[in-house]
Regions:
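Acidic, low-complexity/disordered tracts enriched in E/D and polar residues
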Residues: 1-32, 36-39, 82
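Long, charge-rich, low-complexity alpha-helical segments
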Residues: 26-82
Length: 82
């Protein structure tokens, strides 16, 4: 299971803010949805299902994009594997 740091804030326009570091980032609509789903506590499989419901895309491509995005968030120390 992947856990987003509780302190992470997401604006409606797609800005992510980490108040512990003061860092902020801009994400696209897909990234914004992923952050939203992580905040809800959804699993990777649930996130993929929701993304496929929202965006008409190949499930394998969506999985790769999710994996890449989660790896990036991990490098930024915004998520942790539980």
């Amino acid at each position: 299971m992947i856990k987003l740091k509780k302190s992470i804030a997401l604006s409606e326009s797609g800005f992510i803010f980490d108040p512990t570091t003061g860092d902020s980032y801009s994400v696209n609509q897909t990234g914004s949805k992923i952050i939203e789903y992580l905040k809800e506590g959804l699993s990777e499989d649930q996130i993929i299902d929701k993304l496929n419901d929202t965006f008409d895309s190949d499930k394998e491509l969506m999985q790769k994009d999710l994996d890449d995005f989660l790896q990036h968030l991990k490098q930024l120390k915004m998520i942790e594997n539980v």
